[in-house]
Amino acid sequence: MFQVEAFFKNIILEDIIMAAITAAMVKELRESTGAGMMECKKALTETDGDMEAAVDVLRKSGAAKVEKKAGRIAAEGITRVASEGNTAVVVEVNSETDFVAKNAVFQEFVQDVADKALKASVDKAGDGEDVCAILDMKSDLEEKTIVIGEKLSLRRFEKLTGECVASYIHGGGRIGVLVAAEGATGDAVKEALTNIAMQIAAMNPQYISRNDMSAEELAKLREIIEESALNDPATLPKPILNKLIDKAINDKVWSDEDIATYEEHKSNMQYLFNFLSKEAASQLAELALADRATITADKIFNGLVEGRVSKQLKEICLMDQVYVKAEDGKQSVAKYIAEVGKAAGSEFTIKKFVRFEVGEGLEKKNEDFAAEVAAQLQ
């Protein structure tokens, strides 16, 4: 009898507590914590409507959620910049999905990270360093992880200071660029630097100029281009290619079928490799590699390699690149800078640039939709 009475008393008590928890209370708790509506209602019920105690309950459960998300891969996200005077910073903060990267709460958080990084005592952090600890944002990160519901990661930041600094954000934050210059200043130079930042975002140079490359880097580039040419006999100078073909025929390296194909199409060497077997082309490459010393000493071959090295340098060195806004489609970035400097009455030079592209170098998680749904239901 007493057990039945106690049971009904508990039900009545729960109803009273539930009735006392108003929609306004749930809304207030949601706004202060960012937690879901049902989580807020449950926390208020557990604490008999005590707002501070409910916040503690959500924090404790949230901490568990943060720990659970820690093992996930965060390779999406955005970049943001902040600047003050002649100093600017670019940051990259990662999320698990590009959907979250478009979230206003996440974007506001990343801007807060940029503002904090601008005032940091170090100019650069990342590559395994604890950026979160450096910026003293551990609690902020945990809070946003709870609110957003995904693993978030403060990956890296870098600051630049110069006589003139410009920034550019591309694709809603997919790429963030900083450029610092020394020499002339003013609105025209600032505009030119912004244009150059756009150039860097689009063309992804690796160096400011070829003078910034070490002798070892240039030698390595040449070696790669030589190796590529030897492995692709179709692109070799005609005299060298003819010698390799003669050797393939005379030494019976080629099959009778490939020799017959060559005899049929040798009058039009430009299309020969469209008809030769893959095996025949591979055999020519092997012959070229075996005769590397002779071929690499050939003046014609060296001319080909130098041409390809020069072309590659025009792609990876900012000053050598064709300026993306060039009206004639030919003007280099170096000539554009000289033109702006002349008009400004004083020269300026690029001191340094930083380019962050979201997720570069990070592992990305690939799951099919069914697997993703199944994982969420577990």
Task: Pin down the residues of each PLM region.
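Accessible peptide chain termini
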Residues: 1-2, 18
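Aromatic (phenylalanine/tyrosine) cluster motif
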Residues: 2, 7-10
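N-terminal assembly/interaction segments in proteins that build large macromolecular machines
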Residues: 10-11, 15, 19-378
